[in-house]
Amino acid sequence: MPVTVRVRRVGHRGPPLDLPRYESAGAAGLDLRADEPFTLAPGERRVVPTGLALELPPGHEGQVRPRSGLAARHGVGMVNAPGTIDADYRGEVGVILVNHGQAPVAFARGDRIAQLVIAPVVRAELELVDALSDSDRGAGGFGSTGQ
């Protein structure tokens, strides 16, 4: 069932960009666009403004995820993937990009730089205990289940 996300344009860096949209009928993410032109040098990271602030419905979050095409073609990804937008955050959405490639990558204002997935949030209640129940895996981590 669709939820309503309220969107406000912020920053005023030029003519209004299109609002994020799903690019196909089965797409999980709305494409976010850069609100200013920039060049990302090899090894450089940058917070890229989107020109948008969101009001997410209670009980939901926004997950900012990298675009696979940028990673495959240019080695550009996100430092914190996914980035989390909390329902009570009202500031401008920024995307932290990093260039893992060997060459600078230029972006124009309006280029798609990330995806925004809206997801429900389950809040946990923590219970402090003296011991945890046993499991087949136990404390094994970092490759302990095989290759």
Swiss-Prot record:
<dbReference type="GO" id="GO:0000287">
    <property type="term" value="F:magnesium ion binding"/>
</dbReference>
<dbReference type="GO" id="GO:0004170">
    <property type="term" value="F:dUTP diphosphatase activity"/>
</dbReference>
<comment type="pathway">
    <text>Pyrimidine metabolism; dUMP biosynthesis; dUMP from dCTP (dUTP route): step 2/2.</text>
</comment>
<dbReference type="InterPro" id="IPR029054">
    <property type="entry name" value="dUTPase-like"/>
</dbReference>
<dbReference type="InterPro" id="IPR036157">
    <property type="entry name" value="dUTPase-like_sf"/>
</dbReference>
<dbReference type="InterPro" id="IPR033704">
    <property type="entry name" value="dUTPase_trimeric"/>
</dbReference>
<feature type="binding site">
    <location>
        <begin position="84"/>
        <end position="86"/>
    </location>
    <ligand>
        <name>substrate</name>
    </ligand>
</feature>
<keyword id="KW-0546">Nucleotide metabolism</keyword>
<dbReference type="InterPro" id="IPR008181">
    <property type="entry name" value="dUTPase"/>
</dbReference>
<dbReference type="Pfam" id="PF00692">
    <property type="entry name" value="dUTPase"/>
</dbReference>
<keyword id="KW-0460">Magnesium</keyword>
<protein>
    <recommendedName>
        <fullName>Deoxyuridine 5'-triphosphate nucleotidohydrolase</fullName>
        <ecNumber>3.6.1.23</ecNumber>
    </recommendedName>
</protein>
<feature type="binding site">
    <location>
        <position position="80"/>
    </location>
    <ligand>
        <name>substrate</name>
    </ligand>
</feature>
<feature type="binding site">
    <location>
        <begin position="67"/>
        <end position="69"/>
    </location>
    <ligand>
        <name>substrate</name>
    </ligand>
</feature>
<dbReference type="GO" id="GO:0046081">
    <property type="term" value="P:dUTP catabolic process"/>
</dbReference>
<dbReference type="GO" id="GO:0006226">
    <property type="term" value="P:dUMP biosynthetic process"/>
</dbReference>
<comment type="function">
    <text>This enzyme is involved in nucleotide metabolism: it produces dUMP, the immediate precursor of thymidine nucleotides and it decreases the intracellular concentration of dUTP so that uracil cannot be incorporated into DNA.</text>
</comment>
<keyword id="KW-0378">Hydrolase</keyword>
<comment type="similarity">
    <text>Belongs to the dUTPase family.</text>
</comment>
<keyword id="KW-0479">Metal-binding</keyword>
